[in-house]
Amino acid sequence: MASEERTSALRIRCAHCDAVFDERALPYDADVDSLASSALREKFVRLSLDSESVEFLNRARARGRDECERLARKCTELRRTMSLTEANAILGRGKMFVFSDAHVETLMRACGEGAGGGWFLDVGAGEGEVTRTLARRFAGTCATESSPGMASRLREKGFDVVLESDTVENVVRETRARGGDVSEDGFDVVAALNLCDRVRSPRALLRDLKRALKAKTGILILAIVVPFRPFVENADGTRSQPDERLDVPSAGSWESGVDALWTELIAPLGFDLVTLSRVPYISEGDHLYDAYVLDDAVFVLRAPP
């Protein structure tokens, strides 16, 4: 009850539409019947706001308004010469939340026996907050990140292997070269959370992720922001358009965006759907708002040979 009372006045801002709301309006449900694909309708698993999610929402408030404002000013200065990702890494900001430990347990349970253990790969892991939640279930973890600052943050967290790289083309070989005893056949579970709208070629990314998975048994956890509004963040802080365009709407309902991502991107590459869920993609707040949020679709997939 105490946590519920504490969060009653939270101010959360949607980073897409600028709407302001409290935690009770965070998106977890969906109009499942409106999904065009029967596979999507049948595999939808509803998650919900829980105590771990609420704890994350309160972090900015716990840090204090003055400290949040100081960090925001410093971030603005740094962004004159570098990307937001790199500035956040230097300042210890930019923590993200996609799902709680209980959420992960629900999704892994749907995958059946053998979904835990073995080796886990998190591609584009950021500062490692979500990586750590997932990594608890595995014997070994490799985290990749293209930002030097974020890669340093990952090393501080003590993951088994950290690769500073913007590609996963040779990730199994590189992990083994650094002492990781991942199978030559690939990783047991791979996560790519909110990368498809930030890379030059999302199809190439998914093909590489599929090759990094163990055939038959490997699981891919893929989170994509909906509506889909892609851009590439360059090292100097500028933005450019991806090389590859997808026929996916940049506005409209979550359901229409998910349908388009499934038919345009995911299904044609041969993935089988295990579960689909809707979760808020939460970013740590600042002196203006307690948190910022985007709308995520989480696809749990298998890649048959």
Question: Predicted regions span which residues?
Answer:
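A short glycine-rich, Lys/Arg-flanked "PGG" loop and its adjoining helix->strand segment in the class I
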Residues: 204-216
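Short conserved loop adjoining the S-adenosyl-L-methionine
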Residues: 169-184
